[in-house]
Each structure stands twice: as C-alpha cells, then as structure tokens.
Amino acid sequence: MIFVSCTQDSDWIYLFDGKDVKGLRGYKMEEFPLDSWLIKDGNLKTIPEKKGVDLITEDTFENFELELEWKLQSGGNSGIFYFASEQGDYIWQSAPEMQVLDNIGHQDRLKKVTSAGALYDLVAPSKDMVNPIGNFNKVKIISKNRKVEHWLNGEKIVEYVAGSNHVQELISKSKFSKMPLFFKSYHGHIGFQGDHGEVWYRNIRVRKL
C-alpha cells in the first residue's frame, strides 16, 4: 500500500528549516528548551551534557505526512513519536514511536522490533535501511485513516493499521500493556526524543492530509 498525495508544496509546515524552529516546544513546556537543544550547521541537535528534554509540536495531527532527516553518534538512540498526548509524565507513555538507532553499536539492534525504523517494540522493519554512522537518514511517516507507514531512506519498512486487532494483540504482549495511556488516541502531537544522548535532526516538515 502506497499513499500518493496531491497537495502543494505550500501545504508543508516547516518545523525546522536549518535556521529557525517553528511550532515546536518542550514536552509539558510552553517554550522551546534552549538549554537542551541548539541549532548548529543547519541541524537541530541535542546538547548531551545538558538535561535531555523531548520536543513536541504545538499543533496536533491525525492524517499527516512527516519528513525529516536524522543522524546519530556511535551507539546512539532516539525516537520520533506521533499521536502523543501530555497526560503522562513522559511522552512514551502515550505515543507510539518510530525508532531512531545505531543498528551497529546499540544493544537494541539485537531485536528487530527495537531496531531502526521499527514501530518501537511492536512491529519490526522489513529490512535494515540505516546508513552508516555519520550519514543522515531520510524518514517519512504517513498516517491516513489509521493506516500508518514508516519509510527509511526511500523504502517502506513498516506498515500497520492503528487500533486494529493485530496491533492491539501486539500491545497486550508488550511492556506497553502496563501503560494505560499508550496508543489510546489516533490524533496528537508529533515528538522527538531528546534524552537519549546526541542526535541531529534537519529538514523537518509536516503536512496535514
């Protein structure tokens, strides 16, 4: 299944264009966490020696297309969240996550369901599409009428239907079964994990479908 969008370029909302951050703030914060993230060389990156803070969009999304690029340091780990609420203390208590990972140097590589591109701890990617450390990886996430796709470096690697019996069964067998807020909504904030070490993001844009 491939979604084709006919929307214009003007429909894109640039959350980060290499110079400015727009429409992003800290999780459970009113402002952008300047002490935890900085803009450098056209990238939005964490400051690892500072307290990590996750980012979320000011707006919420249900049917959307998200595009961005990421890279990590060796052994790095991060994540891209969607359908997030701010009811819990942490974003991962409510939001499903596309895993961002060094598939060579991080222990989460040992399980496919926690490797790069996975619907974290639920749906494994169909193939390993991660570029070598030091190179950026292109991501696309599409959500349309609860059908969700994860794309990495031009390949669709995850596809599922949010709220389906299959996904609910996977959740029931995972650690998320003990989290009452997890994946209860199919509309929410998009987020970026900032408390797992150094990560670089760039060219972050989203549009509603």
Give residue ranges: language-model regions:
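Carbohydrate-interacting regions of secretory-pathway proteins
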Residues: 6-209
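Bacterial N-terminal signal peptides
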Residues: 1-2
